[in-house]
Amino acid sequence: MTKLSKRQQQILDFIKKEVKTKGYPPSVREIGEAVGLASSSTVHGHLARLESKGYIRRDPTKPRAIEILDADFSASNQTDDVISVPIIGKVTAGQPITAIENIEDYFPLPKRLVSSEDHVFMLEVMGDSMIEAGILDGDYVIVRQQQSADNGDIVVAMTEDNEATVKRFFKEKDHIRLQPENSNLEPIIVRDCTILGKVIGVYRVIH
């Protein structure tokens, strides 16, 4: 392989470190911060040169998709058994708040827990309306994107007021009931709502 400049070596080393410790590569912004480059275009330029020299391969449709081709980097560190799941802005599980539909970060999950055919995202929960289902304030729910739900499913739903909430879904005669799992709270009754996905798991940090 063609010899790298000092800066290119710094960037490659940082990408390797992030893949080893987190299971997925860093963003362009994170690379810039790590090596002291304020311009994202400069970082992109260095990545392009690393790619042209055969050290990495990128997927232009995915901002963090960087595969390390360096022969010295063990294949075991490529974490083929891990999938990077996007973390979307917070959604409430108490009083609904307007959904923030932007990716804040990525989180590595074992592929055995998430089918590669599923489109999955994670959301941080705020509030205590789902505590009796074991979903607590500050938890991250793992959500499979889908537009329909069966009665009793725990879903992320967007109401007619364009607010998102985590609730148990029930379609009844002339309305939809979004039922909290907290006996102190009343259900949300709406004529219609948009299902953003079904909750298939919960991730919690124990302090």
UniProtKB/Swiss-Prot annotation:
Keyword terms, alphabetized: Autocatalytic cleavage, DNA damage, DNA repair, DNA replication, DNA-binding, Hydrolase, Repressor, SOS response, Transcription, Transcription regulation
CDD domains membership: HTH_ARSR, S24_LexA-like
Residue numbers annotated as active site: S129, K167
Pfam family, one: LexA_DNA_bind
EC number(s) per entry: 3.4.21.88
SUPFAM superfamilies tied to this protein: LexA/Signal peptidase (SSF51306), Winged helix' DNA-binding domain (SSF46785)
Any GO MF annotation of the entry: DNA binding
Gene Ontology biological-process annotations: DNA repair; DNA replication; negative regulation of DNA-templated transcription; proteolysis; SOS response
Class of this enzyme: hydrolase
DNA-binding region boundaries: 28-48
Reactions this protein catalyses: Hydrolysis of Ala-|-Gly bond in repressor LexA
Record-linked InterPro entries: ArsR-like_HTH (IPR011991), LexA (IPR006200), LexA-like (IPR039418), LexA/Signal_pep-like_sf (IPR036286), LexA_DNA-bd_dom (IPR006199), LexA_repressor (IPR050077), Peptidase_S24_LexA (IPR006197), Peptidase_S24_S26A/B/C (IPR015927)
Annotated site residue numbers, Cleavage: A93, G94
Its biological purpose: Represses a number of genes involved in the response to DNA damage (SOS response), including recA and lexA. In the presence of single-stranded DNA, RecA interacts with LexA causing an autocatalytic cleavage which disrupts the DNA-binding part of LexA, leading to derepression of the SOS regulon and eventually DNA repair.
NCBIfam families: lexA
Entry similarity comment: Belongs to the peptidase S24 family.
Quaternary structure and interacting proteins, as annotated: Homodimer.
HAMAP family the record matches: LexA
Cross-referenced PANTHER family: LEXA REPRESSOR, LEXA REPRESSOR-RELATED
Name recorded for this polypeptide: LexA repressor
Organism this protein belongs to: Geobacillus sp. (strain WCH70)
